[in-house]
């Protein structure tokens, strides 16, 4: 499970050093892809296979499902961390997420997310205020 917030930097070769706590789960390989709110999703290969299976069950007659799957999968990149726990983030994904050198890597349960640090701070500032007011119905049965 991915938890916490980390603030790494991209190096000059567009490589990210994965947080140490994430490396074991991602050591055998991972998939980077476009996420909502202009971040990148980071899935273990195993979790990505589950996500892909869910997508395969979507009706091909749904234009919205086809569009989502095309955008999601066409931007996906499979990576294997090097011995130092580094991965290269492709230029197209860096551009999509507006990544500069300063990043925020957050744990989001079954996945990690990579954000531009300033974008993450702005998102958190906007959403954190309403967090304590969130209705139970958002995630039924959680509390």
Swiss-Prot record:
GO molecular function, one term: DNA-binding transcription factor activity
Signal peptide: none
CDD domains: MraZ_C, MraZ_N
The SpoVT-AbrB domain, residue ranges: 5-47, 76-119
Subcellular compartments: Cytoplasm, Nucleoid
Keyword terms, alphabetized: Cytoplasm, DNA-binding, Repeat, Transcription, Transcription regulation
One Gene Ontology term, aspect cellular component: cytoplasm
Gene Ontology biological-process annotations: negative regulation of DNA-templated transcription initiation
InterPro entries per record: MraZ, MraZ_C, MraZ_dom, MraZ_N, MraZ_sf, SpoVT-AbrB_dom, SpoVT-AbrB_sf
Keyword match Transmembrane: no
Family: Belongs to the MraZ family.
Subunit description: Forms oligomers.
PANTHER family recorded: TRANSCRIPTIONAL REGULATOR MRAZ
Name by which UniProt lists this protein: Transcriptional regulator MraZ
Species whose genome carries this gene: Kocuria rhizophila (strain ATCC 9341 / DSM 348 / NBRC 103217 / DC2201)
Source taxonomy: Bacteria, Bacillati, Actinomycetota, Actinomycetes, Micrococcales
